[in-house]
């Protein structure tokens, strides 16, 4: 596998994990594994700037936006924090701050509570809006649900607060409430929540506020924004906020030295296990707001803060058996079934084994005592075997299966890949259902009223066997089914009918062609007039398209070489989907930026970064991630990074403001 293919593979993998984490609330890997993959991708992109892509996961924050809520723009971008698991990197952060400020400073150390982020807006002492983090620039308005959380004041105490301000924090589900909720779900034979974070996030997105109220969510607030804040100190502002009625952690501490910072980290690395809520690290912030402003931001995170993540906990337990799960792409994942063991405050009974190489490397046998970790405190995995605990009665060696556990097809393994795949795309149940779930998702066909449970029911009843079958459903076919009244049935049919107006690029993405994500789908839609042109394209034509390499091109060719796929696309075409480029799709396209490479940097007022990327592409320009002598100009918002500014000046690259850019393309 060459470097470009490795970068593309990591991007595709991280995009998938972002979606699972932020949209589905169903993470497949731990925080640490995600961070490690992200860091690997960042290192590769840094070493190979020729493959930089503004749509790379390294350039985004992630999203938890839900189409069932109104989306609201954040007045101040809600950025994520840079993460580290290393004390050495904490020292590096401290030294960077010291050198940049060249004056005395304090570090505010706070518990990193493991819940779901929220932004609360107060006007004249009353709560007027509660918005999730979303993609950092806009989030879901969940005000009604947040008003059910008793630790969040609806009306403030006193009268010395600003007339309008924003306060941010974390919505949490205490361990005790989480465990009781899972006991209730288990009794009803419903899927359990993986952890309190998922439970809090899922609860906040419920449509029924009375159920939200019953879940007993809690909240800690940790940052004030706005004009006329009472103090320059972040810590001091939090103490004032506590007087107004906000729940502020009393564990927060101001540190004068790096030694004090490490004392705080080391103490809570042990004592956090005794807290009533989940934590996964310590947040370090420069205390002075003036100094924070001077340090500024990168595109993704503030330079004045960092999150130190605690190392994973480990426990020893017995391996009872290994089962296998099949995903949408046919990837087969081995799962270890274990004796129940307490780990990071939850009971662990299953752990991921990832792939055949991991199983072979561990030399696993049934009955082995194995070490289980929860990297980043979420997904358990087996990291080792206590071979000294083996008796002379060694259990059966675990060998990766050769046939699909769902349909019996012989598994295959693509060159250069660790996973095994079931090739039976059109008749393997988990693949069929997974493809339909991808097809109906928000970023694809966005079909209202349909979700995984409904898809599963329709499939079990034989109503659908592929995505094209959706367009043959009638309201009479589905009304009267379990929890499916006449109104619900009509809403689903209406949603399916409305999806016929979804533009060509999203239909291409919805097809689920391997390695064809949103960005590649856009490139394809711009390069081909309709699906027939794409189907007839050869390798040479495909790889001539910007950002489509041989790996993606061969995947497209493989997809259309399958007769079942060609038949499916034909049926979708007959159903009336937009498998062609319309004049509306191409409206707004110009060549005003043709041949120009443009870097976006900073925080913007008029449009989001993604909207500016679209404007650049629609006007014939190319988004690039790093500044070089070939850069045509930089579109700069507020808080442009000083390193980029210095490099631009050194290379003589033009810097345009938002207004100048909009005038240029008008």
From Swiss-Prot:
Catalytic activity, reaction form = NAD(+) + (deoxyribonucleotide)n-3'-hydroxyl + 5'-phospho-(deoxyribonucleotide)m = (deoxyribonucleotide)n+m + AMP + beta-nicotinamide D-nucleotide
Q: Do you know which PROSITE patterns this protein is assigned to? A: BRCT
Listed EC numbers: 6.5.1.2
Broad class of enzyme this protein falls into: ligase
Q: Which residues cross the membrane?
A: none
According to its UniProt record, which protein family does this protein belong to?
A: Belongs to the NAD-dependent DNA ligase family. LigA subfamily.
List required co-factors. Answer: Mg(2+); Mn(2+)
Q: Where is the active site?
A: 112
Name assigned to this protein: DNA ligase
Q: Per the record, a Pfam family?
A: Nlig-Ia
């Amino acid at each position: 596998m060459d470097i470009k293919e490795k970068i593309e593979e990591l991007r595709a993998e991280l995009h998938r994990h972002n979606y699972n984490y932020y949209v589905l609330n169903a993470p497949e890997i731990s925080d640490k594994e995600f961070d490690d993959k992200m860091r690997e991708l960042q290192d590769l992109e840094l070493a190979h700037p020729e493959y930089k892509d503004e749509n790379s996961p390294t350039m985004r924050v992630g999203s938890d936006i839900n189409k069932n809520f109104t989306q609201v723009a954040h007045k101040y971008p809600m950025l994520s924090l840079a993460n580290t698991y290393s004390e050495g990197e904490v020292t590096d952060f401290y030294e960077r701050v010291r050198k940049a400020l060249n004056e005395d400073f304090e570090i505010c150390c706070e518990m990193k509570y493991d819940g779901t982020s929220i932004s609360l807006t107060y006007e004249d002492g009353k709560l007027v809006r509660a918005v999730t983090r979303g993609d950092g620039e806009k989030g879901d308005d969940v005000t009604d649900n947040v008003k059910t959380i008793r630790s969040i004041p609806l009306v403030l105490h006193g009268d010395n607060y600003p007339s309008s301000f924003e306060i941010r924090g974390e919505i949490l589900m205490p361990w005790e409430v989480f465990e009781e909720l899972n006991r209730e779900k288990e009794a009803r034979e419903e899927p359990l929540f993986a952890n309190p974070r998922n439970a809090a996030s899922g609860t906040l997105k419920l449509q029924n506020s009375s159920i939200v109220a019953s879940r007993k969510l809690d909240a800690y607030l940790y940052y004030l924004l706005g004009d006329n804040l009472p103090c320059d100190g972040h810590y001091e502002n939090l103490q004032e906020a506590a007087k107004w009625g906000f729940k502020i952690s009393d564990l927060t501490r101001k540190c004068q030295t790096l030694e004090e910072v490490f004392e705080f980290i080391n103490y809570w690395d042990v004592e956090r296990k005794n807290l009533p809520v989940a934590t996964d690290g310590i947040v370090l912030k420069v205390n002075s707001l003036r100094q924070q402003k001077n340090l500024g931001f990168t595109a993704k995170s503030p330079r004045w803060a960092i999150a130190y993540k605690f190392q994973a906990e480990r426990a020893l337990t017995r391996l009872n058996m290994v089962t296998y799960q099949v995903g949408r792409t046919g990837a087969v994942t081995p799962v270890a079934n274990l004796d129940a063991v307490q780990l990071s405050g939850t009971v662990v009974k299953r752990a991921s084994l990832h792939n055949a190489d991991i199983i072979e490397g561990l030399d696993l046998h049934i009955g082995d005592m194995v070490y289980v970790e929860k990297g980043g405190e979420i997904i358990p995995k087996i990291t080792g075997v206590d071979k000294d605990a083996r008796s002379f009665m060694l259990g059966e060696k675990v060998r990766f299966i050769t046939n699909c556990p769902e349909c019996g097809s012989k598994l295959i393994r693509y060159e250069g890949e660790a996973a095994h795949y079931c090739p039976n795309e059109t008749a393997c149940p988990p693949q069929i259902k997974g493809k339909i779930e991808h097809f109906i998702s928000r970023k694809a066909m966005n079909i209202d009223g349909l979700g995984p449970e409904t898809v599963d029911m329709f499939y079990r009843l034989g109503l659908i066997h592929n995505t094209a079958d959706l367009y043959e459903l009638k309201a009479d076919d589905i009304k009267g089914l379990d929890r499916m009244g006449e109104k619900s049935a009509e809403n689903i049919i209406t949603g399916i009918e409305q999806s016929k107006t979804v533009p060509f690029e999203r239909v291409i993405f919805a097809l689920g062609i391997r390695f064809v994500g949103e960005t590649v789908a856009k490139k394809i839609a711009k390069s081909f007039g309709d699906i027939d042109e794409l189907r007839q394209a050869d390798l040479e034509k495909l790889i001539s398209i910007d950002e489509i390499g041989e790996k993606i091109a061969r995947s497209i060719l493989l997809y259309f070489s399958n007769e079942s796929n060609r038949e499916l696309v034909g049926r979708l075409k007959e159903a009336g989907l937009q498998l062609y480029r319309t004049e509306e799709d191409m409206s707004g396209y110009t060549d005003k930026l043709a041949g120009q490479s443009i870097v976006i940097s900073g925080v913007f007022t008029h449009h989001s970064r993604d909207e500016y990327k679209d404007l650049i592409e629609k006007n014939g320009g190319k988004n690039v991630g790093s500044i070089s002598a070939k850069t045509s100009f930089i579109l700069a918002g507020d808080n442009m990074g000083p390193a980029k500014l210095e490099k631009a000046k050194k290379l003589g690259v033009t810097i345009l403001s938002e207004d100048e850019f909009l005038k240029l393309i008008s």
